[in-house]
């Protein structure tokens, strides 16, 4: 009976040690993958198209504003047959950003009064 108990404890110890190493390997792989994704995102972020610039070459390349990403909007100018695409911020998102900015200011004042 003592032998079975000792053997069981040994098995549990070995199993926990091997699973801990396995989890460490997974954590390292996840960390490496996350770092590579962050590097790709930073490289892609440098190539964004500013607001009111031509985005016809890549319609998903518009830069972000404070809260939202600008949208590539295409239109035909008066008297022209060529389509023109520029990065623009939709009005409803512009108003939402203004409201969020005012709410942030108001929250700071309340914190100052009661904090």
UniProtKB/Swiss-Prot annotation:
Disulfide bonds join 48-63, 55-72, 62-87, 74-85. It is found in: Secreted. Transmembrane segments: none annotated. GO terms for molecular function: toxin activity. GO terms for cellular component: extracellular region. InterPro entries: Spider_toxin_CSTX_knottin (IPR019553), Spider_toxin_CSTX_Knottin_CS (IPR011142). It comes from the Eukaryota. Keywords: Disulfide bond, Knottin, Secreted, Signal, Toxin. Residues 1-20 form the signal peptide. Belongs to the neurotoxin 19 (CSTX) family. 01 subfamily. The keyword Secreted applies. This is U3-lycotoxin-Ls1k. Residues 21-44 form a propeptide. The presence of a 'disulfide through disulfide knot' structurally defines this protein as a knottin. Its main location: secreted. Pfam families: Toxin_35. Expressed by the venom gland.
């Amino acid at each position: 009976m003592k032998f079975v108990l000792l053997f069981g404890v040994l098995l549990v110890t070995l199993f926990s040690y091997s699973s801990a190493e396995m989890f460490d390997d997974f954590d390292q792989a996840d960390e490496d993958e996350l770092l590579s994704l962050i590097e790709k995102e930073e490289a892609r972020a440098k190539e964004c198209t500013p607001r009111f610039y031509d985005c016809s070459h890549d319609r998903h390349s518009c830069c972000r504003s404070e809260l939202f990403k600008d949208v590539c909007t295409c239109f035909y100018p008066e008297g022209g047959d060529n389509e023109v695409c520029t990065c623009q911020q939709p009005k409803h998102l512009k108003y939402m950003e203004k409201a969020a900015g005012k709410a942030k200011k108001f929250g700071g004042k309340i914190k100052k009064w009661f904090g």
